């Protein structure tokens, strides 16, 4: 963040059943995992990123920020923040000049080999993640 604020971030892929319940349960799990530190530190703000490989919301935008409000609308619980990203709605119109955000979304959505190679050349974090995933699948054994 701009203020060097400590944050607790969780990322999950969600299938098409019980979407809202899964988002809330995952948020609470990630947030409460901070208790395991048991060193009296303050809870960091938790943000969960929920990746959907299908369309769920009616709007055209691929990314939603979800916060919980009271039924009166006068209090917003700013600490509770969940992101939902509908990957099928993501469109990258200029694959030659992708922003870092577009690179991540294109990587998570899936892309052709040429685009993937370009993304990995430009983004060291995606390259490292892709190498770890490749190593994992090489070592994974089916039983």
Where do the language-model regions lie?
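Elongated, amphipathic alpha-helical interaction scaffolds
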Residues: 1-143
